[in-house]
UniProtKB/Swiss-Prot annotation:
UniProt induction comment: Slightly induced by abscisic acid (ABA) and salicylic acid (SA).
Keyword Cytoplasm: yes
GO BP annotations, alphabetical order: leaf senescence; response to abscisic acid; response to salicylic acid
Family listed: Belongs to the senescence regulator S40 family.
Protein name per its UniProtKB record: Protein S40-7
Species name: Arabidopsis thaliana (Mouse-ear cress)
Stored Pfam families: Senescence_reg (PF04520)
Chief subcellular location: cytoplasm
Keyword annotations from UniProtKB, A to Z: Cytoplasm
Record flagged with keyword Ribonucleoprotein: no
Ranges of compositional bias, category Polar residues: 10-20, 47-67
Length: 243
């Protein structure tokens, strides 16, 4: 049994042929394909090597850069925007500010944080891409309360022109009110006083006998719904049904 199992990674071209033959299904290896075939087999499965065979850090960095170039040309990394200055792998992913802009931002954050007691570590992590701010709505679309809170047109309530009533106008209005009250009293006297129903019937009977047929008087008025036989007999006598 092999104690040091070897991990074999296929190239992107072989992965593409495998994915094409898999009935058109998208495989994860098609997107995240890493080619590390440039590494020598001795460096992959030999944990300890002699000092003569050890590579210098500069040569290892050069080999890693060449391997990253192959990675950039395949998978989802090919869709990332390319930088104008450098062609390294990190420049495709992270877009930092230039050195001059970064130094000014660090100095400004350091001066502001020294006054407040903080450090200047937050300035080094700032990116070159500024976050776009949302466009402000026009002034006429803002509500009335928000328009004058931020120093708008009306810092306070709008002035209202309230007319001042003079003493002469007040006296004239009082006289008009008194005259209207007097006219209302005269109209009530002309209409007559309110009388109960039986007195109205008595006055109408005194004027003419034809006004005696009224719902306000008669045999049924004294019954109040208790016995309607007298009402029935009175109606029959008046109509001639009963002699």
């Amino acid at each position: 049994m092999n104690k040091n199992p070897r991990l074999d990674f296929s190239s992107p071209s072989s992965l593409a042929t495998i994915s094409d033959s898999a009935d058109g299904e998208l495989n994860e290896d098609d997107i995240f394909a890493i080619d590390i075939s440039h590494a020598p087999p001795q460096a992959r499965h030999s944990p300890v090597s002699s000092p003569a065979k050890q590579q210098t850090p500069a040569r290892q960095l050069q080999r890693s850069k060449s391997g990253l170039k192959n990675v950039e040309a395949s998978g989802i990394l090919a869709a990332l925007p390319e930088s104008s200055g450098s062609s390294s792998y990190l420049s495709h992913v992270f877009h930092h500010k230039p050195a001059a802009a970064l130094s000014t931002s660090v100095s400004s954050t350091a001066s502001s944080s020294s006054s407040s007691g903080g450090g200047a570590s937050a300035g080094s992590s700032s990116s070159a891409r500024a976050i776009p701010t949302a466009p402000k709505p026009p002034q006429e679309r803002l509500p009335f309360s928000a328009s004058f809170v931020g120093g708008g047109k009306y810092p306070q309530s709008a002035p209202v022109q309230v007319p001042l009533v003079s003493s002469a106008m007040m006296n004239r209005h009082k006289k008009e009110f008194k005259l209207t009250d007097v006219v209302d009293d005269d109209e009530e006297e002309e209409e007559g006083e309110m009388l109960p129903p039986h007195e109205i019937v008595a006055r109408s009977l005194a004027q003419s006998s034809l006004l005696s047929c009224s719902v306000l008087e008669g045999a049924g008025r004294t019954l109040k719904g208790r016995d309607l036989r007298q009402v029935r007999n009175a109606v029959f006598r008046r109509t001639g049904f009963i002699d």
